């Protein structure tokens, strides 16, 4: 899979259905929780730490589900959804590398919000730059991420951690 460098919306939906990386491996959430429309670039090299990166975009439309409820009269995309997008991309990258197991967000270091996504925003861009991928009982990706709204940096997160485990989330 590491040969492909971009993914369109239909391919992301295939990943959400468990069809992209094989049964029992990394999946994206299905809409409306899928927080990007395309992956524009993914690479095992480059990025801020020269250990790989992933970039994605989300087209913002005024009728997106979260604007109707967060907040009435003051619509704003919840910050946690932007953070979740960064975790989603981190897990996708691990699956793209061919690592086995289901993904789970584990933690993040510091998160800073410097702006908001409102219905007037046209496009959100995400970037995740990998610091390390650890392979053991659990595959662990550690990365820093950022988010831009119409080209302006608005979120930054350090030490995003996502793990892949062969164990089911259902006990």
UniProtKB/Swiss-Prot annotation:
GO cellular component term of the entry, any: cytoplasm
Reactions accelerated catalytically: a (3R)-hydroxyacyl-[ACP] = a (2E)-enoyl-[ACP] + H2O; (3R)-hydroxydecanoyl-[ACP] = (2E)-decenoyl-[ACP] + H2O; (2E)-decenoyl-[ACP] = (3Z)-decenoyl-[ACP]
Matches recorded under InterPro entries: FabA, FabA_FabZ, HotDog_dom_sf
Keyword annotations: Cytoplasm, Fatty acid biosynthesis, Fatty acid metabolism, Isomerase, Lipid biosynthesis, Lipid metabolism, Lyase
Pathway as given in its UniProt record: Lipid metabolism; fatty acid biosynthesis
Localization annotation: Cytoplasm
Gene3D superfamilies: Hotdog Thioesterase (3.10.129.10)
GO molecular function: (3R)-hydroxyacyl-[acyl-carrier-protein] dehydratase activity; trans-2-decenoyl-acyl-carrier-protein isomerase activity
Main location: cytoplasm
Entry annotation: catalytic residues: 70
Annotated S-S bridges: none
Subunit text: Homodimer.
Function noted in UniProt: Necessary for the introduction of cis unsaturation into fatty acids. Catalyzes the dehydration of (3R)-3-hydroxydecanoyl-ACP to E-(2)-decenoyl-ACP and then its isomerization to Z-(3)-decenoyl-ACP. Can catalyze the dehydratase reaction for beta-hydroxyacyl-ACPs with saturated chain lengths up to 16:0, being most active on intermediate chain length.
Similarity remark: Belongs to the thioester dehydratase family. FabA subfamily.
Protein name: 3-hydroxydecanoyl-[acyl-carrier-protein] dehydratase
Organism of this sequence: Mesorhizobium japonicum (strain LMG 29417 / CECT 9101 / MAFF 303099) (Mesorhizobium loti (strain MAFF 303099))
